[in-house]
């Protein structure tokens, strides 16, 4: 027990009495121990002594409880005093750090005023960063350093000024203002650049025009770059893993696009020697499911590897950029947003291509956003979207190391200004596969490593390669045979001519893949039902029948001319379609009642 506690404890009546009794007992004990002979009254004295000791013990226990109670009360009083002091403190203010001075003072923006204040001794001014939030006491002294502001207004970066610390931003009402850049937005090595260095070297490398910045307009600071989710979702920056060897039946088209895209990048010196301008864009058009998107992906993959070989790099680390633009998702209901997205996409392409790396901008379903102006087919959005694309392709800035590839199955709906030479120079039609091309496509999906039924293998002496080849030949012969089972449609043209079309006239690479997938599924079901493992020719033939049966209802007999354009049958206008699939009723055929519905196509 401390002296203070002892004094407080002895200040109570019980403590004083305990101390008096303790002294009395001690005196009596000394008398008893000092007497040489004990008289008859000694036993009574001993009894009184024991009673006194018991009373002392009781009082000691009581005194200990009182001491504990006093200690607890003291702690509660101290806690209440601290709480009262805390509640009585004046409020603290917050401000934005603007600059640190050499005399350990700082400039802050607080309550709408710019002030120079002092810092608490426990604040290291060297660790403070511009744009940081600081806490001020009632004397306007910095007592705590906080984080950077995480809420505010969103402004668009127009440009970074030459000093590298300020930027021109545009607000929602197109109001331009100059703001300071917080330290996180400045290049990490900015502090290592000498003051007499060129201003261009001081520009933050992480910022680019068009970025969205979090801005405190009152303090005049930009704190953070906000990712633009709407553009990130539309663009896929990666090299696809599709090669030309994965594409079947399109050898001629592949050669055309390699001449248009790869030659200018791989042989720039020859193009310059002959004063030949590389094409700026390629249009891949044709019926759906015939490999337009697949070719565009293979171009990016092949170009990246060829450029890596040309530079002497490892082809496995080949680098190029394939910006896959989802056409329909570009459209935005707000005026000017679609055009802004297109500007940002080409701005990103220019940045990626600035170091000589090839960049491919691929617009899938191009007709959905770049339709002919003034047709009335859709809204008037194309009147501003099309000129934006035209200005990006061959505007003042120009495109270096950037190739635009568009894919569409309705090239007749794309604005003619986009298709003229100098923009999308090369136009490659992706035809429907013929019998030879179909065999090539089947060979990509029916490979020798697939399990083949033992009976089919036995027919060819156990040679797996010959068995697979025979499977492909038989299924192609069945698919392309001009027999009654393969009759699909009878079309009537405007001049009265009629023509019978077979399923082979509407075949595509996607349909072939679907046939093989059906056959594989049938083979799996056979294993589960019969226990016999392996793919059979009959599985493929049954899959063809099922695939044809699913497609028999697909022709649009309400608007046959429109359907014919999508399906790839162009030429004389079609006015009547009659399905010839067995079991179909004659009611499936339908003529065109009026020509008004076809006015936009004539």
From Swiss-Prot:
Keywords: ATP-binding, Chaperone, Coiled coil, Nucleotide-binding, Proteasome. Gene3D superfamilies: 1.10.8.60, 1.20.5.170, Nucleic acid-binding proteins, P-loop containing nucleotide triphosphate hydrolases. Homohexamer. Assembles into a hexameric ring structure that caps the 20S proteasome core. Strongly interacts with the prokaryotic ubiquitin-like protein Pup through a hydrophobic interface; the interacting region of ARC lies in its N-terminal coiled-coil domain. There is one Pup binding site per ARC hexamer ring. Upon ATP-binding, the C-terminus of ARC interacts with the alpha-rings of the proteasome core, possibly by binding to the intersubunit pockets. GO terms for biological process: modification-dependent protein catabolic process; proteasomal protein catabolic process. This is Proteasome-associated ATPase. ATP binds at residues 289-294. One of its GO terms (molecular function) is ATP hydrolysis activity. It holds the Pfam family Prot_ATP_ID_OB_N.
């Amino acid at each position: 027990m401390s002296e203070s506690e002892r004094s407080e404890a002895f200040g109570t009546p019980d403590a004083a009495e305990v101390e008096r009794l303790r002294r009395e007992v001690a005196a009596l004990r000394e008398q008893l121990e000092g007497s040489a002979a004990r008289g008859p009254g000694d036993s009574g004295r001993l009894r009184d002594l024991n009673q006194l000791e018991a009373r002392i013990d009781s009082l000691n226990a009581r005194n200990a409880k009182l001491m504990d109670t006093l200690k607890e009360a003291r702690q509660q009083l101290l806690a209440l005093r601290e709480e009262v002091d805390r509640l009585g403190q004046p409020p603290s203010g917050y401000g934005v750090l603007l600059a640190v001075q050499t005399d350990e003072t700082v400039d802050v923006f607080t309550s709408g005023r710019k002030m120079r204040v002092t810092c608490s001794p426990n604040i290291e001014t060297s660790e403070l960063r511009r744009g940081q939030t600081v806490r001020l006491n009632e004397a306007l002294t910095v007592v705590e350093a906080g984080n950077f502001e995480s809420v505010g207004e969103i402004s668009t970066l127009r440009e970074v000024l030459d000093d590298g610390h300020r930027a021109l931003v545009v607000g929602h009402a197109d109001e331009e203002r100059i703001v300071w850049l917080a330290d996180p937005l400045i290049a990490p090595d900015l502090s290592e650049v000498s003051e007499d260095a060129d201003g261009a070297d001081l520009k933050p490398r992480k910022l680019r025009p068009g970025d969205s910045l979090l801005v405190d307009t009152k303090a005049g600071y930009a704190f953070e770059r906000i990712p633009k989710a709407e553009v990130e979702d539309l663009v896929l920056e990666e090299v696809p893993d599709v090669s030309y060897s994965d594409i079947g039946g399109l050898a001629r088209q592949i050669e055309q696009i390699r001449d248009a895209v790869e030659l200018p990048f791989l042989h720039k010196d020859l193009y310059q020697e002959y004063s030949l301008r590389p094409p700026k864009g390629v249009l891949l058009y044709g019926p759906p499911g015939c490999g337009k998107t697949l070719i565009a992906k293979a171009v990016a993959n092949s170009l990246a590897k060829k450029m890596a070989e040309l530079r002497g790099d490892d082809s496995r680390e080949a680098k190029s950029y394939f910006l896959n633009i989802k056409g329909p998702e570009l459209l935005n209901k707000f005026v000017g947003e679609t055009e802004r997205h297109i500007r940002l996409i080409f701005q990103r392409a220019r940045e990626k291509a600035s170091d000589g790396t090839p960049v491919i901008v691929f617009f899938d379903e191009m007709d959905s956003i770049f339709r002919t102006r003034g047709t009335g087919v859709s809204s008037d959005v194309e009147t501003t979207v099309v000129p934006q694309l035209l200005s990006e392709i061959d505007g003042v800035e120009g495109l270096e190391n950037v190739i635009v590839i568009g894919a569409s199955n309705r090239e007749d709906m794309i604005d003619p200004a986009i298709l003229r030479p100098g923009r999308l120079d090369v136009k490659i039609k992706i035809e429907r596969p013929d019998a030879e091309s179909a065999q090539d496509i089947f060979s990509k999906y029916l490979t020798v490593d697939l399990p083949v039924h033992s009976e089919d293998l036995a027919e060819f002496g156990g040679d797996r390669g010959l068995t697979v080849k025979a499977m492909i030949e038989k299924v192609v012969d069945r698919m392309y045979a001009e027999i009654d089972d393969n009759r699909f449609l009878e079309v009537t043209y405007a001049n009265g001519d009629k023509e019978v079309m077979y399923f082979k006239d509407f075949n595509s690479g996607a349909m072939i893949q679907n046939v093989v997938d059906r056959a594989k599924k049938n083979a799996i079901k056979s294993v589960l039902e019969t226990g016999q493992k392996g793919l059979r020719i009959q599985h493929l033939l049954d899959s063809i029948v099922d695939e044809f049966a699913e497609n028999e209802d697909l022709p649009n007999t309400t608007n046959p001319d429109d359907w014919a354009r999508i399906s790839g049958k162009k030429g004389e206008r079609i006015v009547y379609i009659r399905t010839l699939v067995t079991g179909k009723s004659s009611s499936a055929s339908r003529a065109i009642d009026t020509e008004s519905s076809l006015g936009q196509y004539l």
